[in-house]
Amino acid sequence: MCIRDSWEIAGLLSPEPLPTFPNGFPKEVLDEFTARTGYQVLCNKPYSGTEVIKDYGEEHMKTGALIVYTSADSVFQIAANEAIVPVEKLYEICAEARRMLVGKYGVGRVIARPFVGDCAANFTRTPRRHDFSLVPPADTMLDVLQQAGKSTIGVGKIHDIFAGKGVSETIRTSGNTEGLKVTMELADRDFDGLAFVNLVDFDMLYGHRRDVAGYAAAAAEFNDWLPTFMDKMRPDDILMVTADHGCDPSYTKTTDHTREYVPFLIYGKNLRHGVDLGTRYCFGTIANTVCDALDVKACLAGCSVWNEIKA
């Protein structure tokens, strides 16, 4: 999951790249973090999330120091064993780090990474991860739709990605299976607006972990779910399927995101079928198309394809 790409899907192009720290965070950042939270720091490198708790988890449990690490993304991640730092305390620490990390150190996300276990052999991350994101610096399609009186329902981590900005209703989910269940239930609801859903398991559990079999099973689950959802859709409902980046589970040189083109699939019973939309230059195409479909005027990055697909 990449915050900047998700913002672009919503029609906001970040004018500058969010900062990354391939050599770890500067001493002044860590000193300020310790002064604010009272905790020392271990690691301070780009690291795989599962490997970092294996390599530093036992030292963390002995010393109480927090495991701070980053990745190729603009993130400040804090891992702590739930037996050493209760989850609510970890959230407080992350919230303080979020307040601290601004300006040139304004990472896209501060991420709480709780884990359990008593030794390196059995350390396991728990589902209680929580993201503390930068507030988008300008309006996105969520704000535009909300201001027009439309519902904006965020499912999964959408609230976290946009720091709640423009989200009128939040439904948190534990993974793909629950996300698909919630989306199916939303098809039965009578609302006028957007349900924005992210299925984070493709990224977090299978893409980054390079789990080809797990990714295939998740894709099969979605494929099995899709026909039932399409049958349930009302005549004026529209489904869009896309991604904010690649995360090829078969690419083994790194565990970071990969750079293939992402899909942009649109379906609606009252839309034209079989239209080739070509290769678009900007994810903001999605935001503008959503706004056009809902008859809401918007001035967002990208160009709508609504005129190409409407019947």
Regions from the language model: what does each represent?
Residues M1-A311:
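Feature captures the catalytic ectodomains and active-site-proximal regions of enzymes
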